[in-house]
């Protein structure tokens, strides 16, 4: 018997990702990127809930079911409202009782 997973709503996933980003960015981003993000976030910043990619296995070395995770990007958007400078991509489990996450940081 399989149990239905209650998926994160986009706003909750965005809040979780942004909180993690703020907590961990200082340890994982170059100081220049942190400065850029802080200076431009108010004008160009974005935190976007996106369709969960199926290539996370290549990034994290673990096969995942895209239906069990939400994907959120944190970065800066350009004049066309496209996120062209991604500082972090988050993969967040929909399982509330066992909330795990993976992050790909800008290199």
Curated annotation (Swiss-Prot):
Domain of life of the native organism: Bacteria
Pfam families with a match to the protein in the record: DUF440
Gene3D superfamilies associated with the record: dsDNA mimic, putative
InterPro entries in UniProt: dsDNA_mimic_put, Put_dsDNA_mimic_sf
Family: Belongs to the putative dsDNA mimic protein family.
Function statement: May act as a double-stranded DNA (dsDNA) mimic. Probably regulates the activity of the DNA-binding protein HU.
Oligomeric and partner information: Monomer in solution. Interacts with the DNA-binding protein HU.
Domain notes: Contains many negatively charged residues, which are arranged in winding patterns on the surface similar to the charge distribution seen in dsDNA. The secondary structure elements are arranged in an alpha-alpha-beta-beta-beta-beta order with the two alpha helices packed against the same side of an anti-parallel four-stranded beta sheet.
NCBIfam families, A to Z: PRK05094.1 (NF003469)
Protein name (Swiss-Prot/TrEMBL): Putative double-stranded DNA mimic protein HI_1450
């Amino acid at each position: 018997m399989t149990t239905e997973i209650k998926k994160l709503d986009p706003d909750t996933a965005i809040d979780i990702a942004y909180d993690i980003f703020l907590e961990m960015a200082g340890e994982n981003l170059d100081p220049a990127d942190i400065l850029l993000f802080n200076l431009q976030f108010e004008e160009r910043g974005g935190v976007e809930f996106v369709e969960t990619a199926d290539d996370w296995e290549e990034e994290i070395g673990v096969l995942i079911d895209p239906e069990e995770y939400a994907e959120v990007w944190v970065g800066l958007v350009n004049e066309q409202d496209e996120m062209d400078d991604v500082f972090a991509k988050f993969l967040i489990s929909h399982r509330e009782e066992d909330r795990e996450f993976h992050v790909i940081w800008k290199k």
